[in-house]
């Protein structure tokens, strides 16, 4: 029987192509032949994509783990000599929680690491191999670059306290300008400083134009050095072609990443396929004075490329279509009315049809009518490019999306409410009725209060009236329902309004359509 590469799955074909690429670049294959002790992952848990790890007890009583990561093991065992650069690639399965199944999943991963003496040449080689890796995978691609030195330099220039930096970086990653400004003010920045930090979100786009603006924006030598490194790097990449973009709000974990960070996207996939960066701070935990840069490719994502597009999403026009998830109900009606007034309405009145998809090919818009609680899911998983969703739903789902705009629509607040005569008893857990389980847990954890959660799906106000709970956590708009049922607001802790969100991969390929 004749063997043909065409009979292989996409991830199998990719593994052959990437192996040939990495070996031609002088990389040796690294194989993890043993289980690591759980303590390795526990000590470096913020480097991992999830703190949840599968553990087991070995025959000698040691607590071991099924590997959630390969880079940590390579960094621990490599031990490069001074002046030496080690180059490894790997093809391993790692074990991580799946966002889709909410269970642990075996994930096929290939990656490349350069450790030891890592200078400009090694950085350019590593990022060049990342770009060439994307080229091997058979779809349009984007490689997105940023630099932690640029971010740290700006935070230094603005005198941002160390304790405030992780939260600000999280908001930068989300492109969440409205909450970033408030957090900056809370961290002690004045209006000018908050505006300067928010301006970082505008430093994204094509390399030449964005670099010119980034260089003009520099406040100190650290920022200028980072911009110079990015300019040299993009010049080396331009010779190889491809779609390379800068986004200086892209940030890695600040405890480990200190230089270049990057992500790679393939058209048709809802999340980054490739992630990498310079992690000298991690490497120096194991080998003082050594540096490191590397990346991982998530091969399982390629299986999605072989699935045919549903008919409703197949291109019927030369114009790029922006897929919008609209919530059914009053909020969706308001948003649709706004879109229609600026030329993005559809020929069919979506309130007068039972269709769930309506479109306007001339305007390049396609609307999906979705249950409000599902909007974030459709956007996160790439079924829709953008959507309008309440902050309550977005927070409850912890959706991995860009939160681009606070529309100001549907303003209300998340509150703790209780009977008018309620007195907290600190000697026992508070019984909390809510449909926002994660929001309630996180709020009470932030104040150090033990709770028992009672999940309900409606008529939440009834729970304390009948003694089912002590308090409720729910959305309050006017407070009329609470007052008419003998309840009062105890605490307001989360302002709610409708947010404009975007899928992170869609934003790379349709940023012009999203920004318009």
Where are these regions (language model features)?
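Domain-level signature for soluble enzymes in the chorismate/prephenate branch of the shikimate pathway
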Residues: 317-516
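TRNA-binding/sensing appendages of the translation machinery
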Residues: 1-64, 124, 128
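Short, surface-exposed recognition loops or helix-turn segments adjacent to catalytic cores
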Residues: 140-152, 168, 245-251, 454-461
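Glycine-rich, N-terminal phosphate-binding loop and its surrounding beta-alpha-beta segment
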Residues: 52-101, 375, 380-389
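Beta-rich nucleic-acid/ligand-interaction surfaces
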Residues: 32-51, 146-156, 250-259, 461-468
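Positively charged, Gly/Ser-enriched RNA/tRNA-binding surfaces
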Residues: 7-25, 36-37, 71-82, 89-139, ...
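Acidic, His- and aromatic-enriched active-site or binding-groove loops in soluble protein domains
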Residues: 52-58, 160-182, 266
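Broad gene-expression machinery/nucleic-acid interaction feature
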Residues: 51-53, 63, 86-90, 107-111, ...
């Amino acid at each position: 029987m004749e063997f043909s590469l065409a009979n292989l799955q996409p991830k199998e074909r990719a593994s052959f192509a990437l192996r040939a690429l990495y070996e031609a670049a002088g990389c040796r294959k690294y194989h993890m032949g043993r289980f690591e002790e759980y303590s390795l992952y526990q000590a470096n848990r913020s480097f991992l994509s999830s703190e949840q790890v599968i553990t087991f007890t070995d025959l000698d009583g040691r607590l071991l783990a099924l590997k959630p990561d390969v880079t940590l093991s390579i960094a621990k065992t490599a031990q490069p000599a001074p002046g030496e650069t080690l180059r490894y690639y790997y093809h391993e399965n790692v074990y991580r929680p799946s966002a889709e199944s909410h269970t642990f999943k075996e994930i096929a991963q290939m990656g490349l690491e350069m450790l030891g003496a890592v200078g400009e040449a090694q950085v350019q080689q590593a990022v060049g191999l990342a770009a060439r890796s994307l080229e091997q995978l058979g779809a349009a691609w984007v490689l997105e670059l940023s630099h932690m030195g640029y971010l740290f330099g700006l935070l230094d220039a603005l005198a941002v306290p160390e304790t405030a930096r992780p939260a600000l970086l999280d908001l930068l990653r989300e492109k969440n300008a409205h909450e970033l400004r408030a957090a900056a003010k809370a961290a002690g920045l004045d209006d000018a400083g908050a505006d300067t930090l928010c301006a970082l979100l505008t430093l994204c786009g094509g390399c030449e134009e964005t670099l010119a603006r980034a260089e003009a924006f520099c406040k100190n030598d650290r920022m200028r050095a980072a911009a110079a490194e990015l300019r040299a790097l993009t010049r080396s990449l331009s010779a190889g072609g491809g779609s390379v973009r800068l986004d200086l709000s892209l940030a890695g974990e600040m405890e480990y990443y200190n230089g270049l960070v990057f992500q790679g996207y393939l058209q048709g996939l809802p999340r980054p396929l490739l992630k990498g960066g310079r992690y000298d701070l991690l490497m120096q935990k194991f080998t003082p004075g050594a540096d490191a840069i590397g990346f991982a490719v998530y091969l399982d994502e390629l299986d999605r490329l072989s699935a045919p597009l549903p008919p409703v999403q197949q291109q019927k026009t030369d114009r790029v279509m922006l897929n919008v998830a609209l919530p059914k109900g009053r909020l969706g009606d308001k948003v649709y009315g706004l879109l229609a007034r600026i030329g993005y309405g559809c020929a069919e009145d979506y309130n007068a049809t039972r269709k769930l998809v309506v479109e306007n090919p001339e305007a390049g818009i396609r609307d999906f009518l979705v249950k409000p609680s599902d909007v974030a899911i459709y956007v996160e998983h790439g079924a829709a490019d953008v959507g309008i969703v309440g902050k309550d739903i977005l927070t409850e789902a912890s959706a991995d999306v860009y939160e681009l705009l606070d529309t100001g629509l549907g303003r209300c607040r998340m509150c703790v409410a209780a009977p008018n005569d309620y007195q907290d008893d600190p000697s026992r857990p508070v019984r909390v009725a809510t449909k926002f389980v994660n929001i309630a847990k996180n709020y009470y954890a932030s104040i150090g209060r033990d709770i028992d959660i009672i999940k309900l799906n409606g008529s939440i106000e009834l729970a304390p009236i009948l003694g089912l709970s002590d308090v409720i956590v729910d959305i309050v708009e006017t407070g009329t329902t609470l007052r008419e049922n003998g309840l009062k607001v105890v605490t307001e802790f989360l302002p709610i309004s409708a947010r404009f969100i975007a899928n992170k991969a869609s934003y790379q390929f349709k940023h012009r359509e999203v920004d318009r």
